[in-house]
Amino acid sequence: MSDTERNKASGDVLYIITCAAGSAPLVQEFVKVAQQAEWDVCVILTPNATQFVDVAQLAQLTGHPVRSEYKRPEDPDALPRADAIVVFPATFNTLNKWALGISDTLALGLLCEFTGLKKPILAVPVVRKNGGLDAHPAFMRSVRLLRRYGVHVFYEPEIYPPRNEVPGEVILDTLHKILVRQSQ
């Protein structure tokens, strides 16, 4: 199946939600990979992630404003509605809040909303193996909860050491497999 056929079957708007992590600058390359697969990409940042990436450059690359804050109710939506979401990089903090249903940022609000709508979501945590946070009881509990909610969590630090920094092509291929499964 070509990339064009893949997206016609699955929708064409992809939200990439990016958290404040050292690997956040990698989102720029992931945007390019997704665009090559003909996704219309929109980037949503956690408030702290705005300090880790070049917001203006991401807006220019995607052709959409990069959002990190809620809009006022009377303001029109600046972004098209997403058909799928990839959370990369997903941090310990965001995963735990999301699993508890806390929506105190735009990124978390969208994740909670789309989880409830059963939309395809792929989360790629960047939690260092044996770094302490991976052993915190809340982390794996949150991963299990999100999976039970229908979220696909790609956490394979043994394959992508040390922090599960998965290449964009692998993330997109995993998303494609999720979309194919959901369409059957």
At which residue positions do the language-model features occur?
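A cross-family phosphate/adenosyl-ligand binding-site feature
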Residues: 1-184
